[in-house]
Amino acid sequence: MPQRTYMVVDPRRDHSFRVPRPDLAVTLGTPEPCTQCHTDRDVQWDAAEISNRFPDSRADTPHFATLFSAASRGDASAQAGLVMLADDSGVPAIVRSSAMEHLTLIAGKLESGTVSRWLTDPNSLVRGAAVA
């Protein structure tokens, strides 16, 4: 893989920070790293290649980017999913706090119990997002 520098100081020869998700590239327009090098291929090729090489991959599972995209478009139907994501201690704190940030784009008032859960979270990033 060709080297790419992230944040000015972090040269890498990998796919970046996440596993390629050609399905999200098609539905949300997210960057698709495989076809940046394999310029003679398209996203459909990438999807088939990942499926063939990694049959047990989680590439078909729901991804938080779908909720974030919906909230960014003002789609209030994402609210319940964002609250569930923010409550899920099994996902990274940055994702949880980002879910809270996206809630501000679409939510009216949240139940005080919801916010108070986040204010007492062990992670400072989550607590900080709850205050904002």
Residue ranges, per PLM feature:
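Sequence context surrounding c-type heme c attachment/ligation sites in exported
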Residues: 1-68, 73
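Feature representing long, continuous alpha-helical segments
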Residues: 15, 32-35, 48, 80, ...
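Active-site-adjacent structural elements in folded domains
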Residues: 19, 84-86, 99
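Sec/Tat-exported extracytoplasmic proteins
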Residues: 38-41, 89, 107
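Residue-level signal for secondary-structure boundary elements
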Residues: 45-46, 76-79, 94
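Structural detector for internal amphipathic alpha-helices that build alpha-solenoid repeat scaffolds
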Residues: 63-74, 94-108, 114-117, 127-132
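Amphipathic alpha-helical scaffolding segments comprising HEAT/armadillo-like alpha-solenoid repeats
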Residues: 76-87, 108-120
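Short inter-helical turns and helix N-cap capping residues of alpha-solenoid HEAT/ARM repeat scaffolds
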Residues: 90-92, 122-124
